[in-house]
Structures are given as C-alpha cells and as structure tokens.
Amino acid sequence: MLMFVGLGNPGAKYARNRHNIGFMAVDEISRRHGFSPWRRRFQGETSEGTLDSERVILLKPTTYMNESGRAVQEAAGFFKLGVGDVTVFQDELELPPGKLRVKVGGGIAGHNGLRSISAHLGNDYRRVRLGIGHPGVKELVHGHVLSDFAKSEMPWVEALCQAVADNAGLLTGKRDSTFANKVHLALQAKGFLDKGDAGAA
C-alpha cells in the first residue's frame, strides 16, 4: 500500500489558489481512476483505490498547509506505512508553469507543508513538484501562492493535473523518470511546454 498526499488549504476560499495544486492533482487521480468517495478522517480527507494493482490511499490534509504533517503522520501510522511509502504532490515556485520534477528526499525550499511533513515523518519521502512559476521577487511570493490561478492559466493547470492522473500508476512502480517524461510530453502535445522542456530533470 502507498499513500499519495496532495498539499493545499481547505475550504472554498483557497480551492483555486496556486498553493492548492497538490489538492487539484490528487482530486484528478481520484476522479479519473474511480477511487472511493472522499471521507473525513486523519485530520484530512481520504479516497482509496488501485493504481497498477497497487492499493493507494489519497490524502488531503485539512489542517491548513503549515500543519500538514500532523495528518500525514496520523494516516501513515494507521496504515503502518514507512516514509518511503509516501509521495507528496506540492506546488513549486522554482519550476516554470506546467513543468514538474520528482525527487526523493532533499530540502524543503521554504515550503511550509514540506517543513511540517519532514518534522513529523522524516525527510525521505518522494515529492512530485508541480511548477507554478515565480512572481519574480521574494516579497511577492506569499501573495502569489495564495492567489487564484488566472482564468487564462486554467487550461495548463487542468492539462497538468490530467497528465499526472493518467500516468500516476508509474509512480507505484517507482518509474519516476518515465512518469515525468510522459507528463511533459502530454503538455508538449497540447502546446503548454516547449520541446526543450521535456525530461525528468
């Protein structure tokens, strides 16, 4: 069994925020693969199903971003999952819109959701970093991540979440590079990434 965690803030006020692209990604995985209806538990919401014959639980912490680790720790403890069984889908300022990277371990790059998870679970979980772009200067970061995607951005956001969901089964077999390549190729085909943007790096 594996756990895929989408990061975000709960409630309609935050639903379309850039900071909530992790929620959007796991919502799409649940929808496209016929997972169970979301239900409240573990200080979050869960949906369960199967990807490539592997049982997967999706978790959206409802603790607010800064306390995400509490929900992840509670769910991981209940299912007896190790840190290596956890994959976190997060927004990433340092990647251009629509690009992603997959990495096990590493720093938190100022991301409060990752900081909380690392404090509660350790650092060696897998991160799927979903690019939202940087506003250009540090002072604008807070407002950038907590503002909604513009209407003009939604086509690439939806395409990214769909490609992540379509290829999520590759993550159950730790085929991270293949997953990243297939997602990037899907966005290229729709004109959201240039050909030079493909690849897992």
From Swiss-Prot:
Alphabetic keyword roster: Cytoplasm, Hydrolase, RNA-binding, tRNA-binding
Known catalytic reactions: an N-acyl-L-alpha-aminoacyl-tRNA + H2O = an N-acyl-L-amino acid + a tRNA + H(+)
Annotated site, Stabilizes the basic form of H active site to accept a proton, chain positions: D91
Catalytic residues identified in the record: H19 (proton acceptor)
InterPro entries: Pept_tRNA_hydro (IPR001328), Pept_tRNA_hydro_CS (IPR018171), Pept_tRNA_hydro_sf (IPR036416)
Discriminates between blocked and unblocked aminoacyl-tRNA (site feature) positions: N9
GO molecular function (one): peptidyl-tRNA hydrolase activity
Any one GO CC term of the record: cytoplasm
Record keyword tRNA-binding present: yes
Similarity comment: family membership: Belongs to the PTH family.
Functional note: Hydrolyzes ribosome-free peptidyl-tRNAs (with 1 or more amino acids incorporated), which drop off the ribosome during protein synthesis, or as a result of ribosome stalling. Catalyzes the release of premature peptidyl moieties from peptidyl-tRNA molecules trapped in stalled 50S ribosomal subunits, and thus maintains levels of free tRNAs and 50S ribosomes.
Subunit-structure text: Monomer.
Listed name of the protein: Peptidyl-tRNA hydrolase
Classification lineage: Bacteria, Pseudomonadati, Pseudomonadota, Alphaproteobacteria, Hyphomicrobiales
